[in-house]
Amino acid sequence: MAIVFQSHGGAEKERAVPGPSVRAGRPATGDVAVDEEADFGYFVPPLDAPENYLPNTAETLGELDELGEMMIDVVATPTSEDPTEDSTLPPVFTYWGQFLDHELTARTDREGAISSMVNAHPPVASSTVESQFRNARSPRFDLDSVYGGSAVGEGIDADVVKVISGLRHPTLKNKMRVGTAVDPGPLPDNLDEHRDLPRYGQVQSSVREAALRLAQAAMTPEAFQKFSDTLPQRAIIGDNRNDENLVVAQFHLSFLRFHNKAVDYLASHDTGWIADFSSAQALTRLHYQWLIVEGYLKGVCDPVVVDRVVNDRASHFFKFRAEFDARRQNTRLGNALPLEFSTAAYRFGHSMVRAFYDYNKNFGRPGTGILPRATLKLLFEFTGGGGRLDDNKKLPKNWIIDWTRFTGADPHDAADGEPARLARRIDTELAPPLHTLFKEGEDQADQQLKALFKNLARRNLRRGYNLRLPTGQALHKHLNQIGAVQSSPIQDVSALFAAKPDLKNFLAGTASRFHERTPLWFYVLAEAEAAGGNRLGEVGSCLVASTFVGVLLADPDSALSRGFTPDQSPLKMPDNSPIDSIAKWMRFAAVMQ
């Protein structure tokens, strides 16, 4: 059915004007959602001003590598984390942020002619980056990672559409397909076992065959053989990055379940809404988009900054897009996202990742289950590509997440020595597993290259240098000059680290003068650390909130553009209260007790 939103008197709501359409194409190998090519551009207009950038020298690259090595938490041990690194944010924010990143951007970290970690020096010219470095995901919060996107575009044939159709339930056509976890158990709660991602092993043979044809056309024979061998346990979801670790996989599952519960609710309640796919999809998107601002952004960002951006209708974001369009008239695709956001500021979430989690009663407190905690390594292994799913190619029941431990619904500190039910602080220290990433670099014969690919901090710092991002001070100055922030640039970042003399002395002693020309990603983390690490500082908050709010306002059908609030929704909790928190989202979806 067509969803019609009626106003109830008064002036018509201001509607954002949609930008140019992005260019759709065949999905990347192994994904289901169609690719939608769009632009990246600089929020700080590219200038021939050396002081705005890191020095263009090989020595700078070496010092970035040294800085990356210093960003790993040295207090943590193989079995415990430093409790002083705990923030006040529940751990769901880490993986909620990852899900949102996958909604907006794709293929920004691949080695290529435009962006390279290995050959990061010299940096790529700004004009080349803006004309050739492309986003491969629709820059909209439209849940294409859940629903597959719009299957219309060049090269989108019957096989692409057939695989997208596999996302839907095979007989209950208004619902999304979900998977069922299998023994061994026990379940972590008294809910059902239908809490695995859908996998290719459970779909019709015609869907599997279409997926294999698409993969074979795009892969080497060796890669295709591996893809074919592992297809049964591979998740059939729009963006396969949402099955790279178990927490984001279970977060993705909550959307499938929310959609299905919306269908059930509309069928069993006299709301006036038709209980069909379109209604459930529209309501799922609206609730999700409202929570982005009121739940996620106001958790990780300074709420004052978020309100300022919303009230200003993200004017600085739309000015950025207009300036980019003017610079790139002949090469633009439209719907640009800021490079400073996607390759620096939004990577703040890496610092929130824990090495250990109080995951559920089987892998967490009270410690009488299977293991006293879940390691990050295990959370990567119990996925479609992790190699630990059982012979049934499905998630074991004992690995279903207990969301009460991740959403703040059942908090617990770390006084007993086990992991707190909190994310790590947003600061300049990363958990030790991020020094040696589990699934990266294994195909590199050269040990130095393998070490580079596995070290997340070095990767982020090199990528920012290679893409010629402005320094933190340059971005901060620009935001201040245009009235987007009220604070002044941090002239000497090393002064923030009096309690970390080694880091302080390193920054001040670098030939690249990192203390006053600070890599943007590090600057955003340092700014947050100086404020306590429980949320981003003003610069980080401004860039993240401006991008998210701008993306929502650029979509005339988004919750923010329409002025949607959960109390307007026909969907309610059992006590008739609105679904207005991430905990209520999980409970409505029946993935949290």
Predicted regions, residues:
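Juxtadomain coupling helices with adjacent low-complexity linkers
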Residues: 256-259
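Terminal regions of secretory-pathway proteins
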Residues: 1-241, 246, 264-593
